[in-house]
Structures are given as C-alpha cells and as structure tokens.
UniProtKB/Swiss-Prot annotation:
Gene Ontology cellular component terms for the protein in this record: nucleus; transcription repressor complex
Organism for this UniProt entry: Xenopus laevis (African clawed frog)
Superkingdom classification of source: Eukaryota
Protein name: Insulinoma-associated protein 1
Family classification: Belongs to the INSM1 family.
SUPFAM superfamilies, A to Z: beta-beta-alpha zinc fingers
Region Disordered, annotated ranges: 1-111, 131-175, 269-305
TM spans (from-to): none
Primary location group: nucleus
Annotated Basic residues bias: 1-12
InterPro entries reported for this sequence: INSM1/2, Znf_C2H2_sf, Znf_C2H2_type
UniProt keyword Cytoplasm present: no
Low complexity bias spans: 160-172
A matching Pfam family: zf-C2H2
Amino acid sequence: MPKGFLVKRNRKSPPVSYRVREDEENRGESLPGWMLLATMCPTGGAPPPSSPERLASAAPSCNNPRPPPAGQFGNPEAVPQTLYSPTRPVSREQRERKYLGSPVSAESFPGLGSSSEALLFPPTSTANGHHGLALLPPVSSSSSISRTHGKRPAPEPDVKAGAAPGTACKPPAAKKTKAIRKLTFEDEVTTSPVLGLKIKEGPVEPPRPRAPSSGPRPLGEFICQLCKEEYSDPFSLAQHKCSRIVRVEYRCPECHKVFSCPANLASHRRWHKPRPPAVPAVQPKEEALSDRDTPSPESGSEDGLYECPRCARKFRRQAYLRKHLLSHQVTKEPEEAGHMMYQSDEQRPQAKSPPSLNVPQECHPCPVCGETFPGKSSQERHIRLLHSSQLYPCKYCPATFYSSPGLTRHINKCHPSENRQVILLQVPVRPAC
C-alpha cells in the first residue's frame, strides 16, 4: 500500500460544508470497502463502545490469521484511528452520516481504490460467514455512486441538450456554391461578351502519338489546347494567335461604329433615337404688334434664329427667347401711366419710376397710332415729331398726356393740394356779418 493512502483524520472536523439527504442514509452498504474495513478492524484501537452489533459482526474478520494491511508496508502511522469524539458519545447513525457524507472518502482518492481492491478484498464466500464483505459492491461502482454526491458531472460535449443520448450529432451541411450554375451555360464558356472573343468549334481528331525526341524534353509541354500546336518555350505559346479564336464585332447600323460588347452597342443606339420635339412657346394674344416698319436698334444680331412674336427681336438660342417672353407677361402699370410722357429723362421724377427688371427691355407702343418701339426714348421722339398737336400738358408739372381724362386723373392723384386751392379761389367770398 503506498504511503499516505489511508487518510489520518484529526479530531477537528475539516471546514467542508455539505448536505446529508435521507436517501443517502439508506445507502450504508455503498461505502468504499477500504473505509469500511478500516473502521471495522483497526489495528491499534478498540471499537467504539456504543456499537455492540458492529463489534459482533467484525469479530470473525478480526480473528483472521492474515496480517493487517498496514503492517505489510511498515507504515503504522497510516492506520486510521477511531472517528469518535471523546467528549460526547458517538452513535451508529452519527458515524454512518459522517462516513456517507464525507467528501474525503468520495473525492480524495478515487483512482487508488480500484488498484488496491485485490489487496484489501480477497475472494471470499458466504459459507465462511463473512456476510458483510461478500455483499459489498466493487470499489469502482461504489466510488462512482459516491462521486455523484459531490460536484455535478460535466455534460458530454458531443451530445446536444435536446437530443437523445444515443443519437450522434450530424455535421452541418456544406453550402452550395453559385459557381455550379454558371458552368451549365455553354455560351459563357465559349464566348467572352466583354472582350468580344469567341472560340470556334474544332474538328474532333484522335490524339496524335507523340514523336520521340532525341534531345531532353522540357518539364512542361507547351501545347495550345485548342489547335494542338506545340511550341518550344512558353513565350512562343503566349504570342501564338490561335485560329479557333475569332473576334466578334458589333457594328452600329447607323454610324458604323464597332463595339466588342453587345451591351455597349445597345447603349450607343439610344443616342440615335429621335427625340420628341420641344413644346412650342405659347403664342401671345397680340400678334398684330409684331410687324414693324423699321428694325429696332436694340434687337439681336442678324444671324439670330429665334424671333420674338411681339417685338421682333431675334435670339441665338430658344432658351433666351423663352426668358424674353416672360418679360411680356409681367403685369402692366395702371392705365394712366401708359398715357403719361415726360419731355426728357432728366425731368422724370425718381419716385414715380417703374421698378427695374432683370429682363430685356420690353416694347413701348405709341398710344396714338399704336406703333411699338423698343425703348422709351424712341417712343417719346416719335410722339414729339408726329403727335405734338394732340398733347395735354400738366400745368403743375412737366408731364404731358394724350387725353383729357388722363390729365384729370393725374391732377387728382399727384396734385390734390394745388387743385384744392384752385377750387377755393373760384368760390365767391361771402361778406362778413
């Protein structure tokens, strides 16, 4: 028996906390054999006085002429003493509880108990009267049972928690790659839609026998896999232009431009489609005013392609014409402002000047004959020269009007204080009372 195999207990209990259950009390026979033998037949001590039944059952085994196991190895210190306290009586139930619930007996030396089973328990029969030793289970089974009182056994890693213990885990199925589907199309193998190349079908020929060469054969065979032509070095094979590889060209039927990809040709042909015509500008209501006798000095150049239907101005681009037409749709001034004319630009009051627009100048029609002019100065010059007899000047300001109602509205609006004084002067003065 190796040294230190039997545990020497002290009087002070070890600081180990454990629970004793009722089902453990009924398992008195599941004690390890070496613990039961050490307690029943100690070498240097007497059995406890409070257990007469255990003393009577252990008497035949103590009279056995075989020497005690501790004496075989010459280690008298390893013999365990009786496990009872001298200060208080020890009963049978307390001893069984101490041995059943002791973690040392179950956990300390589980492996050494099975190796020393042949030394402690020789084969005996029930005929000799050793009923206690014959009914004991093997040490390996008892140690496995008592081992369950301690720590929880770790679960097996191969068995899942929800699966049955007999079924084994299946390995995860491998994912199918998408490259398998691409190999089923023959066009993708023989045609390159990006490079515009295609491999022609070659004649099926039996493999030609290899000609014996006198010189040393290179490690790799430099043979074209399509036309089966052999080359002496890889550089010659790389420069080889195989006759089975043809270039596919996609030509535009309208401009004869060549493309190597059909998608590029389809994208190019969209430019040849006729675009829908642009929506024509809204025709103004007054189309009669577009005719002019003399060209305007402020109109566009003679090379212009787009002409304004109102003022006959010409523009190089249609966008400029659309922007110019917006200026004709601006709300007009009040009616009296159309009949108002100043003799010169210096005499025009700044307060009554129309707001400036960031658009080209609009045409100014003559209020008498209806002729249009591109600028205000041209209109005033025309009125002074041709319609000077039909003018109604204001006597309070240098403004001139073409009608009597227009002059009256102007006086009532712009000169109400002077007009009131004139009215008061015309009223006869009453004599004082």
